[in-house]
Amino acid sequence: MKPLLLLPLLGCLATIASCIDTVKWCVTSTKENLKCTALAAAAPVFSCVARASITDCLTAIKAGEADAITLDGGEIYTAGLDEYKLHPIIAEQYGTSTDTCYYAVAVAKKNTGFGLHQLMGKKSCHTGVGKSAGWNIPIGTLLSMDFIKWKGSDDKKLEEVVGEFFHSSCAPGATDSANLCKLCIGDCSKSSETEPYYNYHGAFQCLKDGKGDVAFVKHLTVPEEEKNDYELLCKDNTRKPIDQFENCDLAKVPSHAVVTRKDNEELAQFIWQSLSSVKNFNLFSSTPYGGKNLMFKDSTTTLVQLPLNVDHTMYLGPHYLESVKALKIVNIPSTTSDAMKWCAVGRSESDKCDSWSVASLVQDGTTIDCIKGNTVDDCLKKIMHKEADAMAVDGGQVYTAGKCGLVPAMVEQYDQGQCSAPGAARLYYAVAVIKKGSGVTWENLRNKRSCHTGIGRNAGWNIPMGLIYEQTKNCNFSAFFSSSCAPGADPSSQLCAQCAGNAESINKCKASNEERYYAYAGAFRCLAEGKGDVAFVKHSIVKENTDGQGPEWAKAFLSNDYELICPSKGPVSVENFMSCNLAKVNAHAVVTRPEIRTKVVTFLNNQQSHFGNSASEESFKMFTSPDGENLLFKYSTKCLQEIPAHLDYKGFLGQEYMTVMSSLRTCKESTSDLEQLCTYNMCQT
């Protein structure tokens, strides 16, 4: 999370194009407007904008007529669509833990004699159409369990199907089924307080008043003094007490969050600062205004700022998105695509992937769709969200992928002789390379210039910086070296000062092949071309890029001109990497989603039988790239081997490596925004 930056709220910086001095909060009811007006009186930085519904507020925020509103997960999904282009910036936190999730539950009165499997023909109370606990999760659950049968909107609108499933309902916001409004007592046409049975307290009141048989709410909705009169309906068709929600829920879902316009970091920061600076006003109490959950949920204990560049898909996570998308079927395809969606980073990888796709289609008709990502983290997000299926990454990126719910499926093997041995070790050594005679040692590295493969990568960052952190206990790595090239760092920092960009000197410090000094060969080139005093790479990289080997830029370099250094040893010959290295680490691995792991393994085994090093087909080689670059896979890869299905990322990386990473992750600068989000929002995994 971003720490609170205590900047003054008064006045405007000269660099700001348009002065932001007010947070215009959108409200959807008279009671909410009362609370907002009271907030504005206590903190004049706020003003209130009244609209008739949530969707009207989204339109107002997009147009700049309002700035912010707190939404539930289903509404966050809608807000993030192209129609509105809003994103979550602040999450509600409930209770004393750091958990920003809640449980969607089905509540019924005691002794009413039915379970979740017998809901057909019952009367239902919903918080609102499109809301998480009241609609998306319960309806998605009943669809997935095949109790509600729906072929998609080409057949019939979902609201019509749900209206036919239940005897009658109150589902505020329903427009396509009169039956879904039959139990309501106000204006059911809008998701707003104009309907008394709207939202959590309203849906529960609908049940309490005897209008409905079941209410779909969150786990904290039933008041403490009334819990003994109600029970939860579990997915296994049993019932449990209200307090046993962790063992009897429909789903764990992301908390409500404040949304605003995308691509306006300054506005997002101003909203956060404004909320953080509120004094003598309880943001999380609605009782004085005669309502419940006004502006924020009453059960909120604090607010948490989300990492920068988080969009609605990252915040909601793949499991919740799957539930929402299941409710929005427009066309039912007759068959599911068997294409493998491979994610490629940058133009060079995309070109190789396109060649692979053509070769595969010609060979046996297997379709490969090449999905382009800007960075590895961008590709990991695409895999999480089912926009891509797989990619090969280094160990540090396996760690991030694992934190985000992905699994390692296959690993690169660099020894041809071990390709027939399934349990063989797939390892390489992380080393520190210097120019011979430079006088650089491990002990005098401070204030030298450094070349790294990329932020978050194994040999180029995690291992060396982990060792440096163990020595210094200081996370300010940009101050340890005088200047560096560490692709993926802040382009304006000293960690990017030695980077060069591409041939046109653009994309400087980008974590892709568009940065000349990116990855193993790039970090060595940074050293060889005099941009750095030390390069952190893998043990084979010097031999692969000297003595006439490697791309054109490397032809004139000689391996004898370079040496290795390591703690308490060196300089030594580059041949002596086994006795002078920083660590022995796992090879690169292919990561994917758990549910398609077997599909990915089968696909890759088939592909390497056609295009691997030992295959006779010459039109395309999976592990070969122009000029010895590591495109899609490392150039030194001889084959891919399956990782046992029981091994998750922790088991694959090993305890020693996990310990190093835990230590390094003390430094937030070494943790990407993606990893911060994945470890922060545990609803995703």
UniProtKB/Swiss-Prot annotation:
Q: Where on the tree of life does the source sit, at the highest rank?
A: Eukaryota
Q: PROSITE patterns under this entry?
A: TRANSFERRIN_LIKE_1 (PS00205), TRANSFERRIN_LIKE_2 (PS00206), TRANSFERRIN_LIKE_3 (PS00207), TRANSFERRIN_LIKE_4 (PS51408)
Got a GO cellular component term for this one?
early endosome
Q: Where does hydrogencarbonate 2 bind?
A: 453, 457, 459-460
Concerning SMART domains, the annotation shows: TR_FER (SM00094)
* Protein residues bound to Fe(3+) 2: 394, 428, 520, 588
Intracellular or extracellular location(s)? Secreted
Molecular function (GO) terms listed?
metal ion binding
Biological process terms from the Gene Ontology for this record are: antibacterial humoral response; iron ion transport
Query: Secretion signal: which residues?
Result: 1-16
The record's section on InterPro entries has: Transferrin (IPR016357), Transferrin-like_dom (IPR001156), Transferrin_Fe_BS (IPR018195)
* Cysteines joined through disulfide linkages: 26-48, 125-206, 170-184, 234-248, 343-379, 353-370, 404-678, 419-639, 451-526, 475-667, 485-499, 496-509, 566-580
**Binding-site positions, hydrogencarbonate 1:** 127, 131, 133-134
Q: Where does Fe(3+) 1 bind?
A: 72, 102, 200, 256
Name of one Pfam family that matches: Transferrin
Keyword annotations: Disulfide bond, Glycoprotein, Ion transport, Iron, Iron transport, Metal-binding, Repeat, Secreted, Signal, Transport
Residue limits of the Transferrin-like domain? Answer: 23-329, 340-666
- Glycosylation sites per record: 476
- Tell me the subunit arrangement: Monomer.
> According to its UniProt entry, what is the function of this protein?
Transferrins are iron binding transport proteins which can bind two Fe(3+) ions in association with the binding of an anion, usually bicarbonate.
According to its UniProt record, which protein family does this protein belong to?
Belongs to the transferrin family.
Question: What is this protein's name?
Answer: Serotransferrin
